[in-house]
């Protein structure tokens, strides 16, 4: 958001939350009313505040839920489906769905949002890849995307592939980190109403 060039036509924001690893609970977790209360407070600064406007604002939002993605590790190849895995050095990763036991407890991004995201990345020349978080019924994980999707907004998980996630030493590619930065900037620059 800080590197946005020019004046945005539409409102842009970056929301930082914690407690994701324990279910996004508490006053600063995404399961709280933090987001909707903040939007309501902003709307309250206008002359024509109403609850329906807050709900419409949330519904018409587009979000990249930024987290890391499991990078393919050849030493533990059985934990991945190679053709549905993120690889280091291939750019920012988009996870259409997360969860475990199939798609349980996840958000599943719609194809129209995926298409608009691909266009934004292609137009900006950003290297990107799509993946899932490990082999079905073996891997998996959760993020905050499903908590924001409950408002009807378009949400997808995005982030940098990482090897040895949650280990004392994690490994990422500097290329992916840079493409992630470029991807987030392109997403903000390409902000437009949901069609």
Regions found by a protein language model. Give the residues of each.
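Acidic/histidine-rich catalytic neighborhood of metal-dependent amide-processing enzymes
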Residues: 1-93, 140, 189-195
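Short alpha-helical interface elements
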Residues: 39, 142-146, 153, 172-173, ...
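Conserved active-site and cofactor/substrate-binding residues in soluble primary-metabolism enzymes
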Residues: 30-38, 108-116, 139-142, 175-182
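Noncatalytic linker/hinge segments flanking ATPase motor cores
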Residues: 53-62, 102-113, 169-175, 195
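His/Asp/Glu-rich mid-to-C-terminal helical/loop segments that flank catalytic regions of hydrolases
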Residues: 2-13, 160-195
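Active-site-adjacent substrate-binding region
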Residues: 69-76, 80-169
